[in-house]
Every structure is written in C-alpha cells, then in structure tokens.
Amino acid sequence: MNGGVSRRALIGSTLALSAVANGAEAQPLKRKLKIVVAGGHPGDPEYACGGTVARYTQSGHDVTLLYLNKGEGGCPHRSGQECGAIRTAEAQKACRILKAKPAFAGEIDGQSIVDPAAYGKFRKVLEGLAPDVLFTHWPIDAHPDHRAISNLAYDAWLHMAAKPAFYYFEVSDGEDTQMFAPTDYVNISSTESLKREACYAHASQAPDHFYPLQRQVTAFRGIQSGYSQAEAYIRYVKSPGGLLP
C-alpha cells in the first residue's frame, strides 16, 4: 500500500470511528422516500451505490438511476449509436435487478456540457423526479463526465426549494475518484450479491476486471466502518441527514 492510500485510510478510519460513536447503523426509515442516484454513465450508479440502492428498494422506497449519457463511447469498434443502445439495455437490466427505474439526462458520452443552459435543463429533470435523497459523483474525479454531473447535480440542489439529503459517492477509487474521505457508511453485507449481479448486467464493460476492484473498495470501507461490506459517502455539510438505509 502506498503512502497516499495510507493517508486516505487514516483519515477515513478516523471519520468512521466518529460515525460509529454517533450511531452509524441507520434506524428504519418511517416514510416512503424517492431516491435519485445521478451517475455519468450506465454502470456508475450500480458500481458506486448498488448495495445501498438494493437496501432502499427492499424497504419499499422508489429509486431512480439517472444517467448523464448512454455510454456511447464505451464500446470499441462500435458506433456511438450502437453502443448507446447496448448500454441502455444493460442499464435497464441492471435496474430490474435492483428494482430501480432508469432515466437518462440526454448528454453524449465524452461531450458533456456544463453551461447555464445545461444547468437549467438538468435542474428541470431533477425537480421532476423530486428526490428526498440525492447521490452523485464526488467532484474531484479524473473523468470529465463524472465532474460534469457532479457540478450539474450540486447546482440543481442549490436552487431546489425543497432540498433533498445530498451525498457524494466514489467510483474506481484512486483511478477515477480522488481524495475521498467518507463521512457516512451503509452496510451492504446483505445486498452485495445483488450489487454484483447488477454490475455484471453491464456485460460490455469488462465486469470481470472492474468488479473485483470495486469489491476491494467495499471490503476496505467495511473494515473502516465495522461491517463485512460497506459503501461510503460524503454528506454535503448543509444537507439534511438521517435518510440512509
């Protein structure tokens, strides 16, 4: 383990101890919630939050996986249109596994636009979904589409009259997501198998390579938080809390 990972582990472990001391194991949610997980591409919400999504839907809550684009650039030797169709079908399959709903924001893979018009368009999409809880990418990320939807989601949150709880997630930690020091953890020990199945629904995206790496992350987050497997989040400091499963 290199020095950078060790520092992140130390920071995360300190926060985890604080979270456990303050009762990190969530209490049952008493009302039906609407949850939106906003990711850059098909597969991002599943890899980041699949276990958390399964816990929500198993408890009867409504979850929408909102993809910024259809992943048109993710299939070597295929056209963008063909790849987008393949990955849309994979996203729909993953959502069926997690009992979530798919939605697409209409941008193009690798060509994300973040300007006043894009902010307004995304805000309308999010307001139409009216989430009680919003998850999106941590903005310090190597992928421009991840940074784009993070900024779009944050701007929408700032302008929403009824502000949802707002959490950032991690993907491909150390490769895409950078400098991620969690504030909250969700125990996914009972739902990791569903997360795995949903991630493997994205068959065009080499899950045999990427899922074992992601499972190392959730195992590490489990060590930090006292669970077998956990997904980690950063709650925006001005966000409501208490709505994690």
List the model feature ranges, each with a label.
Residues 11-13, 26-129, 158-159:
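Active-site rim/loop-helix segments in enzyme catalytic domains that contact anionic ligands
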Residues 7-8, 87, 146:
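Short, cationic motifs built from Arg/Lys/His that form the positively charged side of catalytic pockets
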Residues 4-5, 84, 192:
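Short alpha-helical segments used as structural interaction elements across diverse proteins
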Residues 12-13, 25-38, 108, 113-245:
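Metal-dependent de-N-acetylase/amidase catalytic core
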Residues 1-17:
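N-terminal secretory signal peptides and thylakoid transit peptides that target proteins
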